[in-house]
From Swiss-Prot:
This is Probable glycine cleavage system H protein. Its cofactor is (R)-lipoate. The glycine cleavage system is composed of four proteins: P, T, L and H. SUPFAM superfamilies: Single hybrid motif. The gene is gcvH. Transmembrane segments: none annotated. It comes from the Archaea. Residues 24-106 form the Lipoyl-binding domain. One of its GO terms (cellular component) is cytoplasm. The glycine cleavage system catalyzes the degradation of glycine. The H protein shuttles the methylamine group of glycine from the P protein to the T protein. Belongs to the GcvH family.
Length: 127
């Protein structure tokens, strides 16, 4: 099975993605992750103004199969949360790189997680 892996973002081995460039970045979970999770039924996220730390858990996604921690690909301040997910968590499954995004973060300089993968490296990992 082939999964979508956009090349305009970086990935953690734990299957979170982060957009690159700009004053703020967007974070979500990969197509592979949403497929492995199955139907997402609940998402727990931090609030705007909270700080997240690269490589550490910042939230939880719950599916019919499992409860999984979400890990931060960057350190910074949460500036927006996708509140649509509280009513429609299935957006994580339906559009993991679009409407199913999780957070927008203002990253701190040098705050990337260790071992962020580019699209080719991540694609090799999930192959």
């Amino acid at each position: 099975m082939s999964f979508e892996v956009p090349d305009d973002r970086r990935y953690l081995e734990s299957h979170e993605w982060v957009t690159t460039g700009g004053d703020t970045v967007r974070i979500g979970v990969s197509d592979f992750a949403q497929d492995e999770l199955g139907d997402v039924v609940f998402v727990e996220l931090p609030e705007a103004g909270d700080e997240i730390t690269a490589g550490e858990a910042f939230g939880v996604v719950e599916s019919i199969k499992a409860v999984s921690d979400l890990y931060a690909p960057v350190s910074g301040e949460v500036v927006a949360v996708n509140e649509e997910l509280f009513d429609r968590p299935e957006l994580v499954n339906e559009d993991p790189y679009g409407d199913g995004w999780l957070l927008e973060v203002e990253p701190v300089e040098g705050g990337d997680a260790e071992g962020l993968l580019d699209a080719d490296e991540y694609d090799d990992q999930i192959a």
